[in-house]
Amino acid sequence: TIIIFCGGILVGSLLENAQLKDAKQITLNEKVNLQSLQLQQSYMESGLADCKTLNKILETNIDELTKKMGIVIDYEKQSFFNEDEFNLQLRDYFLTEIQFLLTSQEIDKTCAKDSIKVIYFYDESAADTQGQILDYLKKVFGSEVLVFSFNSGFNQEPMINVLLTSYKIEKFPAVVVDDQVFQGHTSVEVLMKTICNEINGIKGEMPKKCQTLFKNYK
């Protein structure tokens, strides 16, 4: 029994080390992607790069970062050891996401605005369905909407609290659509209307998908 128990600990430890290595590789990849994007932004400011291409790269990198973070979170849930290291991975992820957010805002200053930036602050409430609503809206609007999600209860990273303070967030879940702040659960209808109006402001016309969606939710 002791041998089996020790063997189980060894296997678990080896598995966790492998998972941690994977997590480190994930964050390294995204850091490299971010550095590449920032260099392309600087290149673009010299007038030699294409805004459309840059925005496409930004969207792809954010989507990949979100997918890969799901893997890191799964690893954390399965882990019994090295909690501090996993928390460092989470910090690294959130900092990288914040850098992507700031980079996207800088790109908007140089290029014609290409997408609506949505910031989602969530807590650990099992009853929170705001994330599902945002997933749905992301599927509907595609590249026209970029979503940045932050765990409001992750106190290990001070920058999250800086964002919460800057947007004066006091109730969760909270959603920021460009500069409009919604605190507490916000319905799909309200967010959809807000996003559609923002897109209308960018393109000068209401997208057909918005007209169809408005009819469905009347």
Q: Where do the PLM segments sit?
A:
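Second-shell loop/turn segments in exported
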Residues: 75-86, 120-125, 150, 179-182
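Structured segments of extracytoplasmic/periplasmic soluble domains
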Residues: 136-144, 194-201
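Typically the conserved alpha-helix immediately C-terminal to a functionally engaged Cys/Sec
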Residues: 125-141
